[in-house]
């Protein structure tokens, strides 16, 4: 492989789900400084559900996006400051404010079959001169050719890169391979392809490796896998594998290991790992950020979290429908008491 990998850290965006969007700007600054020194190419910062995601439905943040982004900007020297925006949650005004604070790259995220709602936000980001990626969430819910059609739409709106985004940690290596190949068949050769993996089936590193073998150049990863559900692709083992394969990148493996163990793991109030609940996310194909919501409902109503998650998967809930988890719990409770 001759192309250098672009490794984007998502500890401070997807990882917000793992700490219920509660982290101090001081901790953000420390983590960003460590990541920057370790050579990652980009660092994504926002509420777990993107700009303006803090709410009763998604979970309020301990601080505003702007406080976190300012703390990140103050500690960056080399890496590209990045954020995430979901149309319908974040607005053009939020995007413009992020740009004023130093954000120069954005991922515009939609459900995997709803790329058309990203057009305005992608176009505005391009007008601002930003690096722009399309982020097709829950990519396992669309077959490869259908997903590629959505990627083609995002490209037509101006995206420099489009991601296969395995939000549920449900894809296997064949699923990743098929989707990346489908993208490559329809996208312009100049348009990059990215992979965003979750660890719910313990396949995040394997899926990311397969993606790179198929031509992906942008890889999402996080310190200690810090992210929703069982976490994202853990950056330390992925970089180790990249070294073993001789792939070009700019990361310092030992520095990443130190940041993961010394800065990130101590912040976790629930271990980010594959366990009975997070494995069920991948098994049922459930949006990874639903984990903490389902666990809260299970505690409240005396149910098994896995039972709730299986029903969430059966009903095909997607990101933004967190409020329906309580409805499902009440339905299950009624069934057990009938």
Curated annotation (Swiss-Prot):
Domain Pyruvate carboxyltransferase: 5-257
Record family assignment: Belongs to the 4-hydroxy-2-oxovalerate aldolase family.
Catalytic residues (UniProt): 17 (proton acceptor)
Binding-site residues for Mn(2+), renumbered to this chain: 14, 196, 198
SUPFAM superfamilies linked: Aldolase, post-HMGL domain-like
Coiled-coil portions: none
UniProt keyword Manganese present: yes
Keywords for the protein's UniProt record, in alphabetical order: Aromatic hydrocarbons catabolism, Lyase, Manganese, Metal-binding
Protein name according to UniProt: 4-hydroxy-2-oxovalerate aldolase 3
Entry EC number(s): 4.1.3.39
Cysteine disulfide links: none
Site description Transition state stabilizer, residues in chain: 13
EC top class named in words: lyase
HAMAP family: HOA
Pfam families assigned to the protein according to its UniProt record, in alphabetical order: DmpG_comm, HMGL-like
Residue positions binding substrate: 13-14, 167, 196, 287
Originating organism: Nocardia farcinica (strain IFM 10152)
Catalytic activity, as annotated: (S)-4-hydroxy-2-oxopentanoate = acetaldehyde + pyruvate
GO molecular function: 2-isopropylmalate synthase activity; 4-hydroxy-2-oxovalerate aldolase activity; manganese ion binding
UniProt-listed GO biological process terms: catabolic process; L-leucine biosynthetic process
């Amino acid at each position: 492989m001759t192309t250098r990998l672009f490794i984007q850290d998502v500890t401070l965006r997807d990882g917000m789900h793992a700490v219920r969007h509660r982290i101090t700007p001081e901790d953000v600054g420390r983590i960003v400084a460590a990541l920057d020194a370790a050579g990652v190419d980009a660092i994504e910062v926002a509420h777990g559900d993107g700009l303006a995601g803090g709410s009763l439905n998604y979970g309020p943040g301990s601080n505003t996006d702007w406080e976190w982004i300012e703390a990140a900007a103050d500690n960056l020297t080399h890496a590209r400051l990045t954020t995430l925006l979901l149309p319908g949650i974040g607005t053009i005004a939020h995007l413009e404010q992020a740009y004023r604070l130093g954000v120069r790259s954005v991922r515009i995220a939609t459900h995997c079959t709803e790329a058309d709602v990203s057009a305005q936000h992608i176009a505005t980001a391009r007008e601002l001169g930003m690096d722009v990626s399309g982020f097709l969430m829950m990519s396992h819910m669309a077959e490869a050719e259908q997903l590629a059609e959505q990627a083609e739409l995002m490209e037509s709106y101006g995206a420099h890169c489009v991601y296969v985004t395995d939000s549920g940690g449900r894809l296997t290596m064949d699923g990743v391979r098929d989707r990346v190949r489908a993208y490559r068949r329809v996208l312009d050769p100049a348009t990059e392809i990215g992979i965003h993996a979750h660890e719910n089936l313990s396949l995040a590193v394997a899926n990311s490796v397969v993606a790179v073998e198929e031509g992906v150049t942008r890889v999402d990863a996080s310190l200690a896998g810090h992210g929703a559900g069982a976490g994202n692709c853990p950056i330390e083992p992925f970089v180790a594998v990249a070294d073993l394969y001789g792939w070009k990148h700019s990361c310092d493996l030992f520095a990443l290991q130190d940041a993961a163990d010394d800065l990130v793991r101590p912040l976790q109030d629930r271990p980010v790992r594959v366990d009975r609940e997070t494995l069920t996310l991948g098994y049922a194909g459930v949006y990874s950020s639903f984990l903490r919501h389902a666990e809260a409902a299970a505690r409240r109503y005396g149910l098994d979290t896995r039972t709730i998650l299986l029903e969430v998967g059966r009903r095909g809930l997607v990101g933004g429908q967190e409020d329906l988890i309580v409805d499902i719990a009440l339905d299950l409770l009624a069934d057990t008491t009938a």
